[in-house]
Amino acid sequence: VMFPIMDGKGRVVGFGGRVMDDSTPKYLNSPECQIFEKGKILFAFDKAYKSIREEKQAILVEGYMDVISAHNKGVTNVVASLGTAYTKDHGHILMRQADEIILAYDMDGAGRQAVTRAIELLQNTDFKVRVLAMPDGKDPDDYVRNHGGKAFKELVEKAVKPLDYLLSESLIK
């Protein structure tokens, strides 16, 4: 399955592909070039920025399907970092629209590490940051498809402060 990757103005700057079987790599993006730098693009920002501005909140997820499922169920302030790497450039994109960032990455090993790195990058910013630890190790796509947009919004309301998340993570280890 191929996904067009657009810049903030809705112009196609690259493509992302996802295999539908168990082969690897699971995702493959266009190579980085002058118009496509993965760390400077938020997937679906061109569609989400109005909702982000209205709600003053951006929900940051990892991948295409997380965003698409959320938007299809009416949760339209969701964007993806195209993997697990949140960057300062992502923050610059969001700072004009949002006061709060909800980190809603997958709760696998890579996702947990990415949340910790994102918390570090966000700690000296003006953003209010909360972390949504998806229940039962699910990713946002699975959760939204199985429970719906309203349930996802309710889950977002229960997102915790970064320190609470980090403390709970240290207790798990």
Q: How does the language model describe each region?
A:
Residues 93, 120-127:
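Arginine/glycine-rich "motif VI" loop of SF2 helicases in the C-terminal RecA-like domain
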Residues 75-78, 118-121, 146-149:
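Short secondary-structure boundary/capping segments
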Residues 1-97, 101, 114-115:
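Phosphate-handling DNA/RNA-contact segment within nucleic-acid enzymes
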Residues 128-173:
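C-terminal or mid-to-C-terminal helical accessory/interaction module adjacent to the motor/catalytic core
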Residues 4, 105-109, 154, 173:
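Generic amphipathic alpha-helical segments used as scaffolds and interaction surfaces in large
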Residues 100, 106-107, 150:
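Histidine- and aromatic-rich ligand-binding microenvironments
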Residues 65, 86, 105-115, 133, ...:
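Acidic, metal-coordinating catalytic cores used for nucleic-acid/nucleotide bond scission
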Residues 113, 117-118, 123, 169-173:
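Electropositive, surface-exposed helix/loop patches at the edges of structured domains
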